[in-house]
Amino acid sequence: MTSADQLLHAELPPRPAVLTALNDEIQSEEPDLNRVSDLVSGDVGLAAAVIKTVNSPYFGLSRQVASVRQAVTFLGLAEVFGVVTGACLRRSFVSNDPMMEQIWDESAARGASMRRLASELHVLAPDRAYTCGLFENAGMALLLVHAPGYAHTASQAGDGMALMERERVRYGVDHPTLGQALMRTWGLPEELALAVRQHHGLAQLDDAEMPLLARQLVALSTMANAALSDERADWESNRALIAHIVEAAEEQLQRLFDELATLDPMRN
């Protein structure tokens, strides 16, 4: 059996070099857009993944982009960094199990949906919402690669809370904890890592001791996950609280929810 210590330390992939280089450039006094574009375009597979993601319906661009440079121009540095982070995350875990593709497809749809909600509601930076959505199930990808029998364990669970309990019993750690640890390893903001850790913890939504940004991210996650699935009980029972946390009217949230529910996450 894979130990919790192994999963939390030895099995966490290091931050990709391209992310470190991108972050250094973006945080410089005068970021060079051409340098940013060149860093991403230097990896053909990464560039293709970025362009494909940016052209998805969730990003709502008025026209398709054909290059990384165009993506940088239309979205800005912060959002492109988020998209590159997502592409690197997907490449960090490789498995022939069909569950892996499902994890990443759902993560891409969730991240883009949370980004869209953040953008429409003007409640927090869209790139942060996007990144948080991508990492929510990153711990599942790690378990699928390194934990024996994980696909079967996951298939036997019902909702997210039941899955977490099964993970803790069998592997000594759950996927939100692993996702949080990975975000910290990659140097991502602590509020985002906390939101990933708590994304199944709806009881934390009205916890004043939890940072507001983290609660807002959990709220958007709850909304996005419900719109992308048939499991809508959490959204429906917490709609008023979610509206309060993101400072929006329930009618506006319902309209956005309905729009998300009609989008095909795999359409490009």
Language model features with spans:
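Helical (often loop-to-helix) elements that flank the catalytic cores of nucleotide-handling enzymes
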Residues: 154
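Terminal helices and disordered tails flanking the catalytic cores of nucleotide-processing hydrolases
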Residues: 1-4, 237-268
